[in-house]
Amino acid sequence: VQGMVYCDTCRSANALGFMR
């Protein structure tokens, strides 16, 4: 499962407040 990549993307999105 792409956990590392997902986490990295989620972190970026979280910074923008996209995924909250």
Swiss-Prot record:
Its main location: secreted. The keyword Secreted applies. Keywords: Allergen, Secreted. This is Pollen allergen Beta v 1. Coiled coil: none annotated. Belongs to the Ole e I family. GO terms for cellular component: extracellular space. On the 2D-gel the determined pI of this protein is: 5.3, its MW is: 17 kDa. The keyword Glycoprotein does not apply. It is found in: Secreted. It comes from Beta vulgaris.
